[in-house]
Amino acid sequence: MAVKIRLLRMGKIRNPQYRIVIADSRTKRDGRAIEFVGIYQPKHDPSVIEVKSDRVQYWLSVGAQPSEAVQRLLEKTGDWQKFKGLPAPEPLKVAPERVDRKAAYEAEAKAAAGLAEAPTKPAKKAAKAEAAPKTDEAAPKTEEQAGAGSGEQG
């Protein structure tokens, strides 16, 4: 059985994502695979290439032939040079870590709060909060007055 290492296309229209697979050379491009050994996402900047190096080395050692596209990917990751005994290529470009949007928003909010010092209550809520204690204090006074008035009558 002739075994190939090739790309299996996934993803949407105009957004290709590939899996690097080990497959029989007679199967169709997106057909059944023997093993999945990596992923390739060309639309990301820099493009994502993840390869299970030990499995690729095994399949190359037992005679699997990489397609042209997969061979170029293996050259970028250094797996092809490792198989052929050549010096390793320069390291891949790594994407900078993304800033968490929520954390950035909270940092901006804290900075804005520092400028405004203490956050104030909206006018309506503040008015309701002040009005509520006055009604509680007013209620006992009216009961005392009512009790004093009823004592005079009784």
UniProtKB/Swiss-Prot annotation:
GO biological process annotation, one example: translation
Keywords: Ribonucleoprotein, Ribosomal protein
GO CC annotation, single: small ribosomal subunit
UniProt cross-references to Gene3D superfamilies, sorted A to Z: 3.30.1320.10
Transmembrane annotation, as ranges: none
Alphabetized SUPFAM superfamilies for the sequence: Ribosomal protein S16
One of the record's GO molecular function terms: structural constituent of ribosome
InterPro entries in alphabetical order: Ribosomal_bS16, Ribosomal_bS16_dom_sf
Pfam families xrefs: Ribosomal_S16 (PF00886)
Regions of compositional bias (Low complexity) in chain numbering: 111-121
Compositional bias (Basic and acidic residues): 127-144
Region (Disordered): 111-154
Endpoints of the signal sequence: none
Family: Belongs to the bacterial ribosomal protein bS16 family.
Protein name: Small ribosomal subunit protein bS16
Underlying gene: rpsP
